[in-house]
């Protein structure tokens, strides 16, 4: 379930007033996903996705993702493109939360990928890596090696039956840190690459 924030017709009117777009005639919550609230918006001619950013997403990191999607889309990567509001920003305030509207990407995900599909996905990811080498934007990796120890310490193992798991994770983290390369190459990656956000039309990757 990924419709944590409910919106109504009054909110839709507010959205319409903030963007140079046709009148929104229909909106529906999207249940897929786990982190943010998503709605499908329809106008007479087009479809869009409204994303309302929930608590787990840091407000200061959102502009990075907006700019990255915008630049990738302009580099012929078939990903959602954030719309700019009338004041020139990709972000608006909705229900006291940050929100954005992005273009709708047609197609459907596949339950199972074959080798050809995986090869095509790999080519696009490689293309993204090459494109982003030239883009001068970056962010701290919130799931990087330096963040793993605080993350592990934040876990509250409430039962003694998990004590072995706690020991296992602690020992593994020590081993990872011990063997972590000191000069590991860095760059922008697709950190959310799952089959439910890889779209196909008639078996062709978008």
Regions found by a protein language model. Give the residues of each.
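Short Pro/Gly-enriched beta-strand edge/turn motifs at strand-loop
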Residues: 18-25, 169-182
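A cross-family kinase active-site recognition segment
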Residues: 112-164, 184-186
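Asparagine-rich low-complexity intrinsically disordered tracts
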Residues: 10, 74-76, 146-174, 178
């Amino acid at each position: 379930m990924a419709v944590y924030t409910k919106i109504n017709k009054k909110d839709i009117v507010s959205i319409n007033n903030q963007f140079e777009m046709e009148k929104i005639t229909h909106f529906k919550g999207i249940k897929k996903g786990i982190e943010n609230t998503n709605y499908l918006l329809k106008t007479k001619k087009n479809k869009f996705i409204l994303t309302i950013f929930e608590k787990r997403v840091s407000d200061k990191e959102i502009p990075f993702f907006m700019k990255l999607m915008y630049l990738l889309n302009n580099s012929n990567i078939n990903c959602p493109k954030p719309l700019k509001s009338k004041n020139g920003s990709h972000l608006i305030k909705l229900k006291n939360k940050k929100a954005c509207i992005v273009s709708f990407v047609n197609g459907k995900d596949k339950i199972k990928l074959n080798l050809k599909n995986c090869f095509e996905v790999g080519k696009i990811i490689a293309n993204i890596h090459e494109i982003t080498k030239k883009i001068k934007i970056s962010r701290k990796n919130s799931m990087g090696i330096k963040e793993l120890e605080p993350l592990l310490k934040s876990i509250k193992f409430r039962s003694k039956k998990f004590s072995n798991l706690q020991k296992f994770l602690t020992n593994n983290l020590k081993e990872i840190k011990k063997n972590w390369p000191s000069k590991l190459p860095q760059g922008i990656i697709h950190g959310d690459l799952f089959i439910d956000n890889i779209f196909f039309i008639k078996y062709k990757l978008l």
